[in-house]
Amino acid sequence: MKKMNRVLIKRPASTFVLAQPRVLALALAAAFSGIAFAQNPTTNVDKSVPTFFNGQAQIVTGFQDKTKWIKQELWVETEFDSDGDGKKDRVHVDVTRPFQTDTEGLKVAVVYESSPYFAGTMKNQKMWDVKHKLGEASPARPVNEQAKFIPVRPEISRTEIDTWLPRGFAVVHSEAPGTGLSQGCPTVGGAPEELAPKAVIDWLNGRAKGYTTLDGNVEVQATWATGKVGMTGTSYNGTIPLAAATTGVAGLEAIIPIAPNTSYYHYYRSNGLVRHPGGYLGEDIDQLYDFIYSGAPEKRDYCNATIRDGLYPAKFDRKHGDYNDFWAERDLLTKIKGVKAATLLAHGQQDWNVVPEHTIRIYDALKKQGVATQLYLHQGGHGGGTPPLEMRNRWFSHYLYGIDNGVERDARAMIVRENAERGTPPTPYLDYPNPEAANVNVYLGAGGNKAGSLSTKAAAKATTEKLIDDVQYKGGVLANAEQSPHRLLYATPELSEALHLSGTPTIKIRVAANKPAANLSVWLVTLPFDDKVVGSNGQVGVVTRGWADPQNYRSLTKPGNYDSKLPGTPLVPGKFVDLTFDLQPMDRVIPAGKRLALMIMSSDQDFTLWPKAGTELSVDLKQTNLVLPVVGGADALKKGLGN
């Protein structure tokens, strides 16, 4: 094989990009893009500057000495006053940047992470009591001790620094309002959490003021910054990049939200139902407020009275679970039109803390409005699946430094397949859902207290089947039971071939209760059910799940994101109502030899409130069906069923 010669592409001002012949075209295009490219660390050039090879920022020797990194602490002035003192809140910021930004006039792009967690969180969290009658107020709110205040913290965090500093970026951290040394009140969503990171990005672009102290007047500027900013983070830290992006702030070029909570309604409610995040039974937005509140003690009385004990109980409606203006303000989908930043989203399919719809609803919306976006799905739980560094590097190299690496032409969806060994690259797909997927109706056949049928054949006659709610039985136990009065189960025959599902299943159900209120929980499972715990409150046998409040039947008339402000109404005992709602989105391959089953329950021990046992649900099988997104459509399903 002929040895390939390396080529140096020379630009003005003695800046270089290292290339190989096969990437020469990319390098040439980049050389005329107006971006300052870099030498390779092996070349005999005195100055260290960002270097790119095969479309990715490379580690540069001159940026590696941690003892020479410049560290700064400052406070950036925001445009809001959330703590009622009549002064604009300031947020605490730290900066780590290459020393060459001082000694050689180097300007660099920024990787930025913001969080309410950096200063620590509350210990021994106490939750709401979930054992009470549906539709009644919860027992008294538990009293929690908020996080300890730490008055001196010049270094906020070290996340992202070791990854990006040696590659020619600066790294910036900030503490969310009301946490650490940032002023203000925690609001858990809403405008302050959008405008605080916006202020930091404005400061990096010379549009906002930064100060050397919390309350002083000595200003500091970011003269070393190019103005190009990328944000990233996981969980709450992944929510904030998207929140900042909804403001449309200039300079925020790219974000990588990992397992972001994109709507506090969809975190604490589902389709009109009080539904807790997996692993945090009894948590609501007020507990999360206490959990993160690490800010100044002298402001806590005001913030607690105004927000936690004032706004929240007046608006969050833990009694009914309905969507309203309070929740809409904390739903980033309502503000998605402002997003311009290129968005690489990541989520785990076994994340039952922040469930997958949080990411998929945003991905779908951004595609529709033409924002550059890419999706990474893995098989793990909450926060456990950061996209490979190559993906993140290509994303930031392209959007922050203008490298023409073709990332915008990559496969739109990268999915880690089931049982993939650690380190196995994700499988690329043209998009998500898989473009070859089509919705297929499957129907329920009698026998659900044991195992009725699930097939493509609609019921010939009207049949009603009943279950009796009893929350003491976990869903996995009910799925494994040969017979149970506490659930209805409908299963396919054993699959003769693997079945690939890609998208969001939807259930259309006609149901009646013997009481004015009832929980409704739906699981899609594989049989025999594997109850091995996986991810965040997941089990291997769970394909996906969904929950809804039958009282909200007037607004549950079609699939898709739930954002109706129409309140629920008490059920008339014995009267059937029709509901249509989504289960959680997923991309799963069901192996041959398994049976796919729909399980209908009332209360879900790990997620819903726990009313006393005895509520009866009746399901009209003829007027109920499941819609499955099957890759290959009806033909693939029939083939998998051996038809």
Where are these regions (language model features)?
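Short beta-strand element of the alpha/beta-hydrolase
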Residues: 105-116
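Accessory cap/linker subdomain of secreted extracellular hydrolases
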Residues: 41-54, 60-63, 79-82, 88, ...
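Conserved alpha/beta-hydrolase "acid-adjacent" motif
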Residues: 352-358
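Catalytic histidine neighborhood in serine/cysteine hydrolases
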Residues: 366-383
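Conserved alpha/beta-hydrolase
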Residues: 165-181
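N-terminal cap/lid segment of alpha/beta-hydrolase-fold proteins
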Residues: 59-106, 495-497, 510
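C-terminal, loop-rich substrate-recognition/catalytic regions characterized by aromatic stacking residues
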Residues: 41-47, 55-60, 73, 376, ...
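Short beta-strand/loop motif that positions the catalytic acidic residue
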Residues: 339, 345-347, 351
